[in-house]
Protein backbone atom coordinates (compact mmCIF):
# COMPACT_ATOMS: atom_id res chain seq x y z
CA UNK A 1 0.00 0.00 0.00
CA UNK A 2 1.52 3.35 -1.02
CA UNK A 3 2.32 6.04 1.48
CA UNK A 4 -0.26 8.84 1.60
CA UNK A 5 1.09 12.34 1.93
CA UNK A 6 -1.42 14.97 3.00
CA UNK A 7 0.49 18.15 2.10
CA UNK A 8 -2.08 19.56 -0.32
CA UNK A 9 -5.08 18.98 1.95
CA UNK A 10 -3.25 20.26 5.02
CA UNK A 11 -2.15 23.43 3.25
CA UNK A 12 -5.70 24.02 1.99
CA UNK A 13 -7.13 23.55 5.48
CA UNK A 14 -4.54 25.88 6.99
CA UNK A 15 -5.22 28.51 4.33
CA UNK A 16 -8.96 28.27 4.94
CA UNK A 17 -8.61 28.77 8.71
CA UNK A 18 -6.06 31.58 8.38
CA UNK A 19 -8.32 33.32 5.86
CA UNK A 20 -11.19 33.16 8.37
CA UNK A 21 -8.86 34.56 11.06
CA UNK A 22 -7.78 37.50 8.90
CA UNK A 23 -7.97 40.72 10.89
CA UNK A 24 -7.46 39.04 14.26
CA UNK A 25 -4.73 40.41 16.53
CA UNK A 26 -1.24 38.92 16.73
CA UNK A 27 -0.77 35.15 16.67
CA UNK A 28 -4.51 34.64 16.25
CA UNK A 29 -4.17 35.67 12.61
CA UNK A 30 -0.75 34.10 11.90
CA UNK A 31 -0.33 30.81 13.81
CA UNK A 32 -2.56 27.98 12.64
CA UNK A 33 -2.95 26.30 16.03
CA UNK A 34 -4.00 29.56 17.70
CA UNK A 35 -6.13 30.62 14.72
CA UNK A 36 -8.14 27.37 14.88
CA UNK A 37 -9.05 28.12 18.49
CA UNK A 38 -9.89 31.74 17.72
CA UNK A 39 -12.08 30.86 14.72
CA UNK A 40 -13.88 28.12 16.68
CA UNK A 41 -14.59 30.50 19.57
CA UNK A 42 -15.74 33.19 17.14
CA UNK A 43 -18.19 30.70 15.66
CA UNK A 44 -19.55 29.89 19.11
CA UNK A 45 -20.01 33.58 19.90
CA UNK A 46 -21.71 34.16 16.54
CA UNK A 47 -24.13 31.25 17.11
CA UNK A 48 -24.97 32.44 20.63
CA UNK A 49 -25.35 36.08 19.65
CA UNK A 50 -27.64 35.39 16.69
CA UNK A 51 -30.11 34.15 19.28
CA UNK A 52 -29.37 36.91 21.79
CA UNK A 53 -29.86 39.60 19.15
CA UNK A 54 -33.58 38.87 19.06
CA UNK A 55 -33.85 39.31 22.84
CA UNK A 56 -31.71 42.45 22.87
CA UNK A 57 -33.77 44.16 20.17
CA UNK A 58 -37.02 43.31 21.93
CA UNK A 59 -35.60 44.86 25.14
CA UNK A 60 -34.62 47.97 23.20
CA UNK A 61 -38.09 48.33 21.67
CA UNK A 62 -39.77 47.90 25.06
CA UNK A 63 -37.44 50.49 26.63
CA UNK A 64 -38.24 53.02 23.89
CA UNK A 65 -42.00 52.41 24.10
CA UNK A 66 -41.88 52.69 27.90
CA UNK A 67 -39.99 56.00 27.76
CA UNK A 68 -42.36 57.48 25.18
CA UNK A 69 -45.53 56.28 26.92
CA UNK A 70 -44.39 57.58 30.32
CA UNK A 71 -44.00 61.05 28.79
CA UNK A 72 -47.71 60.81 27.97
CA UNK A 73 -48.49 59.66 31.52
CA UNK A 74 -48.94 55.93 31.01
CA UNK A 75 -46.65 53.07 32.02
CA UNK A 76 -45.56 50.51 29.44
CA UNK A 77 -47.64 47.67 30.84
CA UNK A 78 -50.82 49.80 31.04
CA UNK A 79 -50.16 51.14 27.54
CA UNK A 80 -49.81 47.65 26.03
CA UNK A 81 -52.84 46.45 27.99
CA UNK A 82 -54.86 49.40 26.69
CA UNK A 83 -53.85 48.69 23.10
CA UNK A 84 -54.85 45.03 23.50
CA UNK A 85 -58.26 46.05 24.89
CA UNK A 86 -58.69 48.51 22.01
CA UNK A 87 -57.86 45.71 19.52
CA UNK A 88 -54.83 47.56 18.17
CA UNK A 89 -52.46 44.94 16.76
CA UNK A 90 -49.17 46.77 16.23
CA UNK A 91 -46.04 44.88 17.22
CA UNK A 92 -43.38 46.35 19.50
CA UNK A 93 -40.90 46.97 16.70
CA UNK A 94 -43.33 49.24 14.84
CA UNK A 95 -44.50 50.88 18.08
CA UNK A 96 -40.89 51.74 18.93
CA UNK A 97 -40.34 53.24 15.46
CA UNK A 98 -43.52 55.30 15.79
CA UNK A 99 -42.44 56.44 19.26
CA UNK A 100 -39.08 57.65 17.94
CA UNK A 101 -40.00 59.08 14.53
CA UNK A 102 -43.70 60.06 14.70
CA UNK A 103 -44.60 61.55 18.08
CA UNK A 104 -48.07 62.73 17.00
CA UNK A 105 -49.17 59.23 15.96
CA UNK A 106 -47.76 57.76 19.17
CA UNK A 107 -49.66 60.36 21.23
CA UNK A 108 -52.84 59.32 19.41
CA UNK A 109 -52.14 55.64 20.22
CA UNK A 110 -51.67 56.58 23.89
CA UNK A 111 -55.07 58.31 23.85
CA UNK A 112 -56.64 55.21 22.28
CA UNK A 113 -55.08 53.07 25.01
CA UNK A 114 -56.30 55.45 27.76
CA UNK A 115 -59.86 55.34 26.40
CA UNK A 116 -59.80 51.55 26.31
CA UNK A 117 -58.58 51.41 29.93
CA UNK A 118 -61.24 53.84 31.20
From Swiss-Prot:
Protein family (similarity comment): Belongs to the bacterial ribosomal protein bL20 family.
Keywords: Ribonucleoprotein, Ribosomal protein, RNA-binding, rRNA-binding
Organism domain of life: Bacteria
Role summary: Binds directly to 23S ribosomal RNA and is necessary for the in vitro assembly process of the 50S ribosomal subunit. It is not involved in the protein synthesizing functions of that subunit.
One Gene Ontology molecular-function label: rRNA binding
Coiled-coil stretches noted in the UniProt entry, renumbered to this chain: none
InterPro entries tied to this protein: Ribosomal_bL20 (IPR005813), RIBOSOMAL_L20_CS (IPR049946), Ribosomal_protein_bL20_C (IPR035566)
GO-annotated cellular components: ribonucleoprotein complex; ribosome
PROSITE patterns in the cross-refs: RIBOSOMAL_L20 (PS00937)
Name of the coding gene: rplT
Protein name (database record): Large ribosomal subunit protein bL20
Amino acid sequence: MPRVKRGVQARARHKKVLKQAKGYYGARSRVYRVAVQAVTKAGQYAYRDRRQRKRVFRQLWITRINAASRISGLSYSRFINGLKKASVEIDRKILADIAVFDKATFAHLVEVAKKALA
